[in-house]
């Protein structure tokens, strides 16, 4: 299933998902710095593995995916399948609604 078929995302619900499943490793605010994972500010339109000051796996750099709604929707289903060799240990969000909500939140919070 593609992002086009996804339910409309709810950024408020996405914020809750981010806080419970993502915030232990990622920040979204400009200049917030990196944690175990990279800061996600400016995520949309950026190429994977290119955030300055973060040590990415070769897999992330070599994948050279452009992050957007479609790529994030697929990636967040199963990160290790989408980018084999990624350092991200998160197993993914199986529910289309959860992925759509998280993407809606990320669009607002990382812009």
From Swiss-Prot:
Source organism, top-level taxon: Eukaryota
Annotated localization: Mitochondrion intermembrane space
Gene3D superfamilies listed in its UniProt record: Cytochrome c-like domain
Main localization of the protein described in the UniProt heading: mitochondrion
Keywords in alphabetical order: Acetylation, Electron transport, Heme, Iron, Metal-binding, Methylation, Mitochondrion, Respiratory chain, Transport
Residues that coordinate or bind heme c: 22, 25-26, 88
PROSITE patterns (UniProt xref): CYTC
Coiled coil: none
Modification type N-acetylalanine: residues: 1
PTM (free text): Binds 1 heme c group covalently per subunit.
InterPro entries xref list: Cyt_c-like_dom, Cyt_c-like_dom_sf, Cyt_c_1A/1B
Similarity annotation: Belongs to the cytochrome c family.
Identification of the protein by name: Cytochrome c
Organism: Gossypium barbadense (Sea Island cotton)
């Amino acid at each position: 299933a593609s992002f086009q078929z996804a339910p409309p995302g709810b950024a408020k619900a996405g914020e809750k998902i981010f806080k419970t499943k993502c915030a232990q490793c990622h920040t979204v605010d400009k200049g917030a710095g990196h944690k175990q994972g990279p800061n996600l500010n400016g995520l949309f339109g950026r190429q994977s593995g290119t955030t300055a000051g973060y040590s990415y796996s070769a897999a992330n750099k070599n994948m050279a995916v452009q992050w957007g709604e479609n790529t994030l929707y697929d990636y967040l289903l199963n990160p290790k399948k989408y980018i084999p060799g990624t350092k991200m240990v998160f197993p993914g969000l199986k529910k289309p609604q959860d992925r759509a909500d998280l993407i809606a939140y990320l669009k607002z919070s990382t812009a």
